[in-house]
């Protein structure tokens, strides 16, 4: 399954209709215009064509993620008030139909990121400066938020970092920790997971980032040995080695060469050989890097523009 949102995508190897060349593609949107919510397509990897299948009405589903088995989809409603929410939907990969199971409040405005480990679902609530944790029920529905983290620190950018912003929450590949990017405080936070309480109230600062960086999204390599962070304001990709909760910086490389202060998403190819970092606001495009399999360092391959205007 390939899941696409305005700022995100996730995948699993299964296609639709038994055809390994085809993937189920889901696109999240903002609905303050003509969009209804989530749209599903059948995407052919060989031809690049997408056939529309279905849609589901949901307010501002700007970020979504499928469950590992592809049976469920978890999508935010990115609202800047108390209506901000997370929804669980059942997904039929054959027909593309989505069926709403339940919706629960995030208790933080503008949820902008979702992650799941099959037991819990996390949201990063950007404007609320909070992280929410939702236990998953056996039927795929979401229980109310179990634990919240409230950010408090701010940063040097008087506009972008004036209030706390949590931008991304991810599970570590060993399943022991949760990492959250503290955008305004220029740091990555680490939380220890426990069977009876997935997040303690106290957090440990895993690593500080250079001031005025704006850490946005974090992703781990398929082998679990490395992690990569994209910084929105400084436009860098920072590579880390990873071992039992510890992130050690090994490289910093530029993704945004025009100082647009709008770098956004970061993903690795399924085989871990390439890394993709998106840039916005000026010369929109995808910076592509080759990954050294031995030490995790990056070498820039090219910048692929998304518009001829660049």
Place the predicted regions along the sequence by residue.
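Asp-box/WD-like beta-propeller blade repeats and closely related beta-sheet repeat scaffolds
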Residues: 97-167
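Residue-level detector of Asp-centered blade-edge/turn motifs that repeat once per structural unit
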Residues: 68-69, 116-118, 173-174, 222-223, ...
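C-terminal motif of bacterial Sec signal peptides marking the signal peptidase cleavage site
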Residues: 7-8
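A short beta-strand motif characteristic of beta-propeller blades
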Residues: 51-56, 100-104, 155-159, 203-208, ...
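Short loop/turn segments immediately following beta-strands, especially the blade-tip
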Residues: 42-47, 90-95, 135-142, 192-199, ...
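Conserved small/polar residues in nucleotide/adenosyl-binding loops
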Residues: 305-310
């Amino acid at each position: 399954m390939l899941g696409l949102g305005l700022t995100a995508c996730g995948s699993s190897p299964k296609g639709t209709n038994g055809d390994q060349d085809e993937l189920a593609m889901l696109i999240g949107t903002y609905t303050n215009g003509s969009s209804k919510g989530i749209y599903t397509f059948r995407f052919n990897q060989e031809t690049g064509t997408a056939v529309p299948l279905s849609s589901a009405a949901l307010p501002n589903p700007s970020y979504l993620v499928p469950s590992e088995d592809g049976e469920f989809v978890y999508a935010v409603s990115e609202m800047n008030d108390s209506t901000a929410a997370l929804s669980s939907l059942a997904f039929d990969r054959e027909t593309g139909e989505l069926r709403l199971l339940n919706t629960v409040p995030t208790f933080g405005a503008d949820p902008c990121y979702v992650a799941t480990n099959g037991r819990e679902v996390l949201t990063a609530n950007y404007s609320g400066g909070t992280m929410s944790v939702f236990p998953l029920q056996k039927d795929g529905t979401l229980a109310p938020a179990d634990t919240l983290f409230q950010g408090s620190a701010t940063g040097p950018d008087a506009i972008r970092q004036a209030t706390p912003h949590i931008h991304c929450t991810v599970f570590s590949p060993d399943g022991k920790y949760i990492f959250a990017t503290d955008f305004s405080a220029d740091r990555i936070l680490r939380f220890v997971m426990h069977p009876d309480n997935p997040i303690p109230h106290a957090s440990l600062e895993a690593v500080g980032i250079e001031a005025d960086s704006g850490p946005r999204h974090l992703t781990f390599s398929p082998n679990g040995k490395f992690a990569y962070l994209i910084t929105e304001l400084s436009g860098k990709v920072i590579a880390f080695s990873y071992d039992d909760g510890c992130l050690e910086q090994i490289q910093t490389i530029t993704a945004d060469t025009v100082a647009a202060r709008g770098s956004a998403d970061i993903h690795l190819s399924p085989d871990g050989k390439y890394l993709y970092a998106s840039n916005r606001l000026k010369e929109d495009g995808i910076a592509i890097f080759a990954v050294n399999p031995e030490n995790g360092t990056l070498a820039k391959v090219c910048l692929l523009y998304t518009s001829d205007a660049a």
